[in-house]
Amino acid sequence: SDVLELTDDNFESRVSDTGSAGLVEFFAPDATANDVPSP
């Protein structure tokens, strides 16, 4: 599978408008291993 860099400009066309399933991993470079994401 290809790895894509998603941005605000291409998110809709690459993810939302494809009509197929996929997996998106969100990454925050300033987050530590102890950070717990909130809803």
Swiss-Prot record:
One of its GO terms (cellular component) is melanosome. It is found in: Endoplasmic reticulum; Endoplasmic reticulum lumen; Melanosome. One of its GO terms (molecular function) is protein disulfide isomerase activity. The keyword Endoplasmic reticulum applies. It catalyses: Catalyzes the rearrangement of -S-S- bonds in proteins. Predominantly expressed in liver. Low in brain, testis and colon. Not detectable in pancreas and skeletal muscle. Its main location: endoplasmic reticulum. GO terms for biological process: adaptive immune response. It comes from the Eukaryota. Its EC number is 5.3.4.1. The keyword Disulfide bond applies. Keywords: Adaptive immunity, Disulfide bond, Endoplasmic reticulum, Immunity, Isomerase, Redox-active center. Within the major histocompatibility complex class I (MHC I) peptide loading complex forms reversible disulfide-linked heterodimers with TAPBP as part of its protein folding chaperone activity. This is essential to assist the dynamic assembly of the MHC I complex with high affinity antigens in the endoplasmic reticulum. Phosphorylated. Belongs to the protein disulfide isomerase family. Part of the major histocompatibility complex class I (MHC I) peptide loading complex composed of TAP1, TAP2, B2M, MHC heavy chain, TAPBP, PDIA3, and CALR. Interacts with ERP27 and CANX. Interacts with SERPINA2 and with SERPINA1. Interacts with ATP2A2. Protein disulfide isomerase that catalyzes the formation, isomerization, and reduction or oxidation of disulfide bonds in client proteins and functions as a protein folding chaperone. Core component of the major histocompatibility complex class I (MHC I) peptide loading complex where it functions as an essential folding chaperone for TAPBP. Through TAPBP, assists the dynamic assembly of the MHC I complex with high affinity antigens in the endoplasmic reticulum. Therefore, plays a crucial role in the presentation of antigens to cytotoxic T cells in adaptive immunity. This is Protein disulfide-isomerase A3. It comes from Papio hamadryas (Hamadryas baboon). The lineage of its organism: Eukaryota, Metazoa, Chordata, Craniata, Vertebrata.
